[in-house]
């Protein structure tokens, strides 16, 4: 038997993937032999029939011998120093020279990194965990690090080792982070982690911090460099940093990239360098089509949104997800933009182009739950690592998903850093946090006995609330001027109040009450609306309790609810008039705005995630006119500060009359911040026009009709006020003057006093 410096049981721990620190065995080690200081090099090389240690600087080779196992090699070299060695291996007829991963002993993660992560406060942990192309001791390669504290062994799998978990076993640190630098591989490598628990079960997992994944249904992570893109949005970011978004116009076009528009042909998309993108088929229901890439969407979607006049695009979740039918809300790759539409750099290009066209980007973010897919976060290291072990806290049975354990520091850090990551690396301008209520209440969609109370016996998830406060506090600290929007459907207090007041720290909250009230109201026969005037007026009773965003989202056009136009009563003309009336009132009402794709041209059918929108409708004049209506409405909204600068201040809104339920008419004033400018809004919610409808106004003069939702160019009957009206010296509604208006059927008027014309008429 050849001489060896290693015991059989130590070799077996390597061979059987049972060692938490293979660096103790493998690599180079100084030893004393026969009174001399020598070096021993050990390597476990499955599939190799022979191996040598190569010293390139000395141009020497040393044959290695096998010990205790046919593929465990050892070599003793009589030298006082040993560095920069390589291993030459023979596999079949092929020989290969490469650097030994176990020669790079110094960890990239510092003790301070690990300390911050363990206490949940490493805000840039994504720069440490995951896969990072780097250089160590003059050798390029990829550094891998993954948190799996309860695993017995973790290995890196990839094309570079033929997906053999024996070849690149990782080292476990004191905090449960496993790491390994693999030399001579680079960007574009596919990889996973092979995780073995103490029962011997093996799990193949995608990288929780992976920056890119394969297109579904494949699940490998891909090494990606996020620092190679050259951004051109410095001016946008600088302006954002010094702007209060709550005093700005915010009109959001909510879009699902996978169903907005498909490429008609499955031909691959061309990249700027002449290469082609991988083809990702959009749907089995539409086999001849493929998804547009991020770059193609930049050239199609951005001009479309810009033409319509929206200020922001909101993307349904673009983090990697395995199932198209989840719409992106069941995420497995929190740090990876979905590869359905291209690479991380392609998504950077999309955001950059949005900014260069003065369009902000909001991304839906899903920190409330995650799916059970085997390659994802579920049961990650053979234990309930990211989720609660008790299903009464750790599972949403209604959705078939798992709930994050917000009380665990590392899990909280994973999510907090993820929110920051999208702003840092992709320059996004806001997040909309999905299903906040499901996070805040322990009994959400759970029957009695299916949930556990908090330490005070209540149903509030205190850890989740603290987590949301931490996210929002850090977001606005690092990235002033961005948006954090809550989809919160209950009356949890102070959702959009700052954290220093005890609030959750969002700066906007979807107004779900307004949405339900208005959709119920507009679905009624107009004759019955007189009995439900409260649906229109109630929102102003609580409007100043939160910073509200009025949203008519994707949730309102699926699951048998019909699209917006299909909810409206009457014939086609009345349906379209109702749609115009609803959205004109929405844009005049205090609050920021969000509407889902397809509403702008009156799609009749529900949203179908498997197909693109019904673009052929734009061949027909009524749908062209509706699109024109939204273009002009956005233009007015953005140009008239009275409609947005005081959305969240009481002085920004005054009712003129909200009690005319007999005619189903409301009228009010919107005021501009720091000026005396205001607009007058009058809404007629029935098809009955009124040729002499009088309302009180605060100032004498000529009121220009800025907007009429019944204009002929929008498909209306063209009833109006011939461009404007002079006031009468006739007090009404506690105002000293009044206007005698013609109210169009199912119409909204927005008027503004023309001070120049008024001054000329008065001779001043």
From Swiss-Prot:
HAMAP family: GlgB. Pathway: Glycan biosynthesis; glycogen biosynthesis. The keyword Glycosyltransferase applies. It comes from the Bacteria. Belongs to the glycosyl hydrolase 13 family. GlgB subfamily. It comes from Trichormus variabilis (strain ATCC 29413 / PCC 7937) (Anabaena variabilis). One of its GO terms (cellular component) is cytosol. Its EC number is 2.4.1.18. One of its GO terms (molecular function) is cation binding. Monomer. This is 1,4-alpha-glucan branching enzyme GlgB. PANTHER family: 1,4-ALPHA-GLUCAN-BRANCHING ENZYME (PTHR43651:SF3). The keyword Electron transport does not apply. GO terms for biological process: glycogen biosynthetic process. Signal peptide: none annotated. Catalyzes the formation of the alpha-1,6-glucosidic linkages in glycogen by scission of a 1,4-alpha-linked oligosaccharide from growing alpha-1,4-glucan chains and the subsequent attachment of the oligosaccharide to the alpha-1,6 position. It is an enzyme of class 2 (transferase). The active site is at residues 434, 487. It catalyses: Transfers a segment of a (1->4)-alpha-D-glucan chain to a primary hydroxy group in a similar glucan chain. Keywords: Carbohydrate metabolism, Glycogen biosynthesis, Glycogen metabolism, Glycosyltransferase, Transferase.
């Amino acid at each position: 038997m050849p001489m060896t410096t290693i015991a059989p049981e130590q070799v077996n721990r390597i061979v059987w993937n049972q060692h938490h620190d293979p660096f103790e065995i493998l690599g180079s080690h100084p030893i004393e032999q026969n009174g001399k200081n020598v070096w021993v090099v050990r390597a476990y090389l499955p599939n190799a029939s022979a191996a040598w240690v190569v010293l390139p600087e000395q141009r020497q080779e040393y044959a290695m011998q096998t010990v205790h196992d046919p593929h465990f090699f050892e070599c003793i070299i009589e030298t006082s120093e040993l560095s920069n060695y390589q291993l030459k291996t023979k596999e079949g007829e092929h020989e290969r020279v490469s650097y030994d991963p176990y020669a790079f002993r110094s960890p990239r993660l510092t003790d301070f990194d690990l300390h911050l992560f363990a206490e949940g406060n490493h805000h840039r942990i994504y720069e440490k965990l995951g896969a990072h192309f780097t250089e160590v001791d003059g050798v390029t390669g990829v550094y891998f690090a993954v948190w799996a504290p309860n695993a017995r062994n973790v290995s890196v799998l990839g094309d570079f080792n033929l997906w053999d978990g024996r070849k690149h076993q990782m080292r476990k640190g004191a905090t449960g982070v496993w790491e390994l630098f693999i030399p001579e591989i680079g960007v574009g490598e596919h990889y996973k982690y092979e995780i073995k628990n103490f029962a011997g079960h093996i799990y193949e997992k995608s990288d929780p911090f992976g920056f890119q994944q394969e297109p579904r249904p494949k699940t490998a992570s891909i090494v990606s460099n996020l620092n190679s893109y050259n951004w051109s949005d410095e001016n946008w970011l600088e302006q954002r940093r010094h702007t209060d978004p709550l005093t700005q116009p915010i009109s959001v076009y909510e879009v699902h990239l996978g169903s907005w528009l498909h490429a008609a042909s499955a031909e691959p998309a061309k990249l700027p360098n002449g290469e082609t993108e991988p083809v990702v088929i959009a749907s089995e229901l539409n086999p001849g089509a493929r998804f547009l890439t991020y770059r193609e969407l930049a050239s199609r979607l951005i001009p479309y949104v810009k033409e319509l006049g929206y200020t922001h695009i909101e993307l349904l979740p673009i983090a990697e997800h395995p199932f198209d039918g989840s719409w992106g809300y069941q995420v497995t790759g929190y740090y990876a933009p979905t590869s359905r539409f291209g690479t991380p750099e392609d998504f950077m290009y999309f955001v950059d182009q949005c900014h260069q066209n003065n369009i902000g980007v909001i991304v839906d973010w899903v920190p409330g739950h995650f799916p059970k897919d085997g390659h994802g976060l579920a049961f990650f290291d053979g234990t309930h690592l990211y989720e609660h072990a008790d299903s009464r806290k750790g599972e949403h049975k209604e959705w078939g998903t798992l709930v994050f354990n917000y009380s665990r520091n590392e899990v909280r850090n994973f999510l907090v850093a993820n929110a920051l990551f999208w702003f840092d690396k992709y320059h996004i301008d806001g997040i909309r946090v999905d299903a906040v209520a499901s996070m805040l209440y322990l009994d959400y969609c759970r029957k009695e006995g299916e949930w556990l109370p908090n330490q005070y016996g209540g149903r509030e998830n205190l850890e989740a609330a603290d987590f949301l406060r931490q996210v929002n506090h850090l977001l606005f600290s690092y990235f002033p001027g961005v948006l954090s929007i809550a989809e919160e459907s209950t009356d949890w207090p102070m959702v959009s109040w700052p954290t220093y007041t005890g609030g959750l720290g969002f700066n906007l909250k979807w107004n779900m009450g307004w949405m339900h009230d208005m959709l119920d109201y507009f679905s009624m026969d107009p004759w019955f609306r007189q009995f439900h005037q409260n649906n229109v007026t109630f929102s102003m009773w609580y409007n100043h309790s939160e910073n509200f965003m009025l949203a008519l989202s994707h949730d309102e056009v699926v699951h048998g609810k019909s699209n917006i136009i299909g909810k409206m009563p009457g014939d086609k003309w009345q349906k379209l008039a109702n749609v115009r009336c609803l959205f004109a009132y929405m844009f005049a009402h205090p609050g920021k705005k969000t509407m889902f794709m397809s509403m702008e041209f009156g799609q009749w059918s529900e949203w179908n995630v498997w197909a693109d929108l019904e673009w052929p409708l734009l061949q027909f004049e009524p749908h062209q006119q509706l699109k024109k209506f939204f273009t002009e409405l956005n233009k007015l909204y953005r140009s008239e500060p009275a409609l947005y600068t005081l959305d969240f201040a009481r002085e920004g809104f005054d009712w003129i009359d909200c009690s005319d339920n007999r005619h189903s008419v409301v009228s009010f004033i919107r005021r501009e911040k720091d000026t005396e400018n205001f607009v007058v809004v009058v809404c007629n919610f029935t098809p009955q026009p009124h040729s002499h409808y009088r309302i009180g106004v605060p100032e004498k003069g000529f009121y220009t009709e800025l907007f009429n939702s019944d204009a002929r160019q929008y498909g209306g009957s063209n009833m109006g006020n011939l461009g404007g009206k002079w006031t009468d010296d006739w007090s009404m509604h506690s105002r000293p003057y009044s206007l005698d208006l013609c109210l169009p059927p199912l119409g909204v008027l927005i008027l503004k006093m023309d001070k120049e014309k008024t001054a000329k008429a008065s001779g001043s």
